[in-house]
């Protein structure tokens, strides 16, 4: 789903991830709030960051970077790893890496629950990180029976993940939004309403309503907006933890070879050759860890 190339929900207790290259994308690691210990990230720009529970680490690989990961302490990392595509005009931009602490992110608290604005802009609040292209990342909880609206502009795609609990999802067009504020506490929704007859989807259950789906824990779906609209997220009789990632689709070819993502074979070959020639740099050796 453009602009995402890869999404991985991981539980990590070891070992270290050896130094490896990236080019043509941003690599993003979001550690969820129940993470224990930390993740140390070193790169060929001589950055050294230590991400902890709730933190976001964003590496713009651009024209090329090498980085490696090491666990810190008695670690049990619960997080998401994203590869976010860069449009062709940004694939040659200089690499960089940024660590955003969880306490720096806006947190919206209401009767419906709470949501962290990890990246992008939501409900008038801006996350602190300026990303190469706008990308919305929300890490939220819904109380039983509550719902939340998330705008989805025309031309954007969204990836929605039920990290915990059962999550209902309804698509609405902007021309007919429900006459309620963006965040609401709704009446408790009986669990039976989340089990309508309908065709089963690969990662969730589809209701008879084609604009409504149910995600069991660990399932995800994607949505595409051909015009401005909303996604309405609903919890039934138990709390629901969701992660939403949304951004504008990149209407360009994608050619991938592992950590290299380009728009054509020639650019891909050039990126691999640049890495093999040492143009991405290398990690400096420290504490006996090879670079």
Residue spans of the language-model regions?
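Jelly-roll (double-stranded beta-helix
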Residues: 1-291
């Amino acid at each position: 789903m453009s602009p995402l190339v890869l999404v991985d929900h991981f539980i990590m207790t070891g070992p270290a991830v050896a130094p490896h290259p990236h080019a043509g994308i941003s690599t993003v690691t979001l550690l969820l709030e129940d993470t224990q210990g930390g993740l140390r990230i070193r790169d060929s720009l001589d950055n050294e960051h230590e991400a902890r529970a709730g933190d976001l680490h964003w590496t713009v690989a651009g024209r090329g970077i090498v980085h490696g990961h090491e666990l810190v302490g008695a670690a049990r990392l619960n997080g998401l790893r994203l590869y976010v595509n860069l449009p062709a005009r940004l694939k040659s931009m200089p690499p960089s890496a940024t660590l955003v602490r969880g306490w720096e992110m806006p947190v919206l608290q209401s009767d419906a629950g709470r949501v962290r604005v990890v990246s992008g802009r939501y409900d008038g609040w801006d996350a602190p990180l300026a990303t190469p292209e706008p990308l919305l990342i929300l890490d939220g909880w819904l109380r039983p029976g509550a719902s939340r609206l998330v705008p989805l502009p025309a031309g954007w795609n969204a990836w929605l993940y039920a990290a915990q609990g059962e999550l209902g999802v309804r698509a609405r067009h902007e021309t007919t939004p429900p006459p309620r504020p963006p965040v609401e506490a709704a009446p408790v929704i009986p669990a039976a309403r989340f089990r309508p007859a309908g065709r089963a989807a690969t990662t969730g259950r589809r209701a008879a309503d084609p604009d409504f789906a149910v995600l069991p824990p660990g399932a995800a779906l994607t949505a595409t907006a051909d015009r401005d609209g909303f996604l309405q997220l609903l919890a039934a009789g138990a709390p629901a933890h969701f992660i939403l990632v949304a951004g504008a689709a990149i209407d360009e070819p994608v050619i991938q070879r592992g950590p290299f993502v380009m728009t054509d074979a020639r650019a891909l070959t050039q990126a691999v050759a640049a890495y093999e020639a040492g143009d991405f740099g290398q990690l400096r050796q420290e504490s006996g860890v090879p670079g």
